[in-house]
Amino acid sequence: NVSLIGGDFKVMPRGSLDKILITGVGLGISKKPIPDNELRVGDKIIVTGHVAEHGATILAAQLGLLDKVKGLKSDTRSLTKTVLKVIEEFRDYVHAARDPTRGGIASVLNEWARTNNLTIRIHKDKIPVRDEVRDFLEAMGVDYLSMASEGIALLAVDSGRAHEVLERLREVGEVNSEIIGEVMEPANNFLKGRVVGITEVGGKVLIEPKSINLPRIC
C-alpha cells in the first residue's frame, strides 16, 4: 500500500476564488512510456507550434497591458488528438518529448543537453514565433525563448524519421511545426551540456534559461 499525497499553490486575485479547490490525479500503466530525456546524437529537435504565447499573455496581463497590446492570447489547449497521436505512431523514433511550460524552450533544451552531456544546436530563424509576441517581449526586455508555452511540445526525433514526423504533425493540424535544431557530440568540454543558437546572420550564441518573475497561472 502506498500513500499518494500531492498539492499545488495558485495565486488568484482577491475575491475571484476564495474557496477550497479539490483536484484529482490519475495513475496508470503504460506499455510504452514516452521518454523525456533520452536524446541521441543526430536527433532532430521539433517544436510543434508558436513559442512563448502563454508567457507573453500572462506578462501583459500582469503589467495591465493586455487590452493595449493586440494579438496576444494564451495557447493553452490539449495536444492528445494531435501531438500525442503522432508520438504514438512514431514511438520508437521519438527519443524525448516535453511541454515547454515554465522556463520555455530554453529551459527544456538546457535540461536535455545537461542530462545527456551533449550539445544541442538550434537555428533561431527556424523557431516559430509570431511577430506580435516577439515585438512585445523585446519591448519588455524579455527573451521569448524563456517564456512559457502551454499548447506546444518539444520533441527529439531520430534524424531518419524526423521529416516524416514533421509532415505528420502538420497533417493532423499542427501546421506551425518546425525542425529547429539537432543534437550533436560536444566539440569540446565547454560545449558539453550546452545549447548553442545559430543567429539569423550566422553568429553563435549560448542559449541559457533567463528567469522572470511570473505567477504560476495555468
Q: At which residue positions do the language-model features occur?
A:
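Glycine-rich anion-binding loops of enzyme active sites
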Residues: 1-59, 182-184
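Active-site glycine-rich loop that binds ribose-phosphate moieties when present
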Residues: 22-34, 67-89
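Acidic, Ser/Thr/Pro-rich beta/coil linker or hinge segments at domain junctions
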Residues: 171-218
